[in-house]
Amino acid sequence: ALDKNLRESMQYEIKHIHESIGVTVVYVTHDQSEALTMSSRIAVFNDGKVQQLSTPDKLYEEPVNSFVAEFIGENNTFAGEVTDISGGKCKVKLDTGGEIISNPISVKSKGEKTKVSLRPERAIIDPEEKMDNKHKGKIEEIIYHGDHARVRLNLLGNKEFILKVPN
């Protein structure tokens, strides 16, 4: 196996070669980071069916369902029920208590059961500005990773809520 820096360097080199020769390349991998780095389009399969075919940024930022959201990248998830949909937002009453305002990705109606996904890099500890979702949690663990720290919180009944905080 290649070390991390060499592996990333080789991924960029292979991507540039693909772009320069101008041919279609099908690359099969289970490494989501590698797929996001090297691809212009990605297909996510589940049980032999394509769940989403998109550009890397659209796949990561706008997954069409919870399977894709949980498959690509890291997520904190909360189960709940939609209590309101309006103005391009939905309110979800969480099964563990509390409420989250979110984008209605694949929900259609009030009363519908759903999952809310939040990427670790999207949450902020002690935000200064007013935000739709502001909740108290308890820091359980901080792990230093060089360019960021992983912070594990107990938040809204989720004891494994992860934040990525830049150093």
What role is predicted for each listed range?
Residues 1-67:
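ABC ATPase nucleotide-binding domains
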Residues 55-89:
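ABC transporter nucleotide-binding domain
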